[in-house]
Amino acid sequence: MPTTPATATHSSSNGTAEAIMLELVDENGTTIGTAEKLAAHQAPGQLHRAFSVFLFDEQGRLLLQRRALGKYHSPGVWSNTCCGHPYPGEAPFAAAARRTHEELGLSPSLLAEAGTVRYNHPDPASGLVEQEFNHLFVGLAQTAPKPDPEEVGETAFVTAAELAERHAKAPFSAWFMTVLDAARPAIRELTGPSAGW
């Protein structure tokens, strides 16, 4: 498996590698512990904190990303602008902004909280399980993305109608429709009724 910022271990100050840890949470989103990232996703999965970002351009089009083929989880599928996991103790908002910049070279404008959603989505292709308490964020992409090729294979801005067409033909992440549907009220508020979200 290729090493990417999302799968790599971190080097500590003494030069030893540290596994990436995630926050485990209860059904209310209260932190109850930590787990190593891959272990948290192995069946049956452990409920952990995550985030999903939806960025739109000035025409109200959603920025999608196709996950890089080297990703250990859901490689090569389309998904929302950015998703990931805060480090233990890191605020979801800060993690969302950080990872959006790391993956896409974007600093979102007007990034706002859009609620939370809890789900359990097994990924048949990998055998991994997304047991997540997901913090949702919406905002604007006011500059062109500059994707990190180790994280993102491709990007596309799509209207609601174009998304429906693409979703019918191309593979998407198991969690995509769940997080999109949960974020729709905030998306409509951001983009206005004419955007069709």
Curated annotation (Swiss-Prot):
InterPro entries: Idi_bact, IsopentenylPP_isomerase_typ1, NUDIX_hydrolase-like_dom_sf, NUDIX_hydrolase_dom
EC number: 5.3.3.2
Binding site for Mg(2+): 103
Catalysed transformations (reactions): isopentenyl diphosphate = dimethylallyl diphosphate
Record-linked Pfam families: NUDIX (PF00293)
Gene name of the encoded protein: idi
Gene Ontology biological-process annotations: dimethylallyl diphosphate biosynthetic process; isopentenyl diphosphate biosynthetic process
Top-level EC class: isomerase
PANTHER family: ISOPENTENYL-DIPHOSPHATE DELTA-ISOMERASE
Requisite cofactors: Mg(2+); Mn(2+)
Lineage: Bacteria, Bacillati, Actinomycetota, Actinomycetes, Kitasatosporales
Protein name per UniProt: Isopentenyl-diphosphate Delta-isomerase
Catalytic residues of the enzyme: 83, 132
Residues that bind Mn(2+): 41, 48, 85, 130, 132
All residue ranges annotated as the Nudix hydrolase domain in the record: 46-183
GO CC terms: cytoplasm
Location relative to the cell: Cytoplasm
